[in-house]
Amino acid sequence: MQGFGPTAVTGNIGFALDPSQWLWSLVGMTKTTPDFAFELAAMAKGARAVAGVDEVGRGPLAGPVCAAAVILDPDNIPDGLNDSKKVGAKMRDALFDQLMACADVSIAEATVAEIDTHNILRASHIAMVRAINGLSALADFILIDGNMIPRGLTTPSQTIVKGDMRSLSIAAASIVAKVWRDRLMVDLAQQHPGYGWDTNAGYPTPVHKKALLKLGVTAHHRRSFKPVHNILYQDKNLSD
């Protein structure tokens, strides 16, 4: 008799249904916290080092996009890992420190110039690949947040939509990337006061947009993003 279980799909190692979600679906419930099921499934198929990858910073008007890759130690996973947006700032900082001590962590960026030269999606993927390549151990399977495998990534991989809510490794990567980028924007805020980057991390808040109009565009602003582009274009028209 065939038993219940996750259904395998062809191509990259993966499942038609989240391997930890199928049981919840049978009882009409939804899993709300990430677990290690994707990682264990990959290991069961021969993977030895499974990395989770996520990026932070697609939406801001200023600053780089940052990515992190994390290989967790199955025997030493910090408690409280979740989507970085669901974890408070103090808890994120504590988890960041724990992960840096107990996991293989790599952090990378794609610059504002790269964002403007390519586009934010391509720049995000560039940062992801850099983070993967920066790991101390050679990951032989990658779990990627989202629905697209970055161009140039040759390691066997699996995309997971809302992966930071479903995979502990991706959740760890999301926390590392966010804490790293938030701290970077705090440093940049000291160099460029008035834009509120220490609190808005470069996102288009009312304070940030008003400061753009009053103080102008800095070298850290993304000129390809419409609010910044419009200010530059308006200034050019006024000078013509």
Residue ranges and their predicted role:
Residues 2, 8, 14-240:
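RNase H-like, Mg2+-dependent phosphodiesterase core
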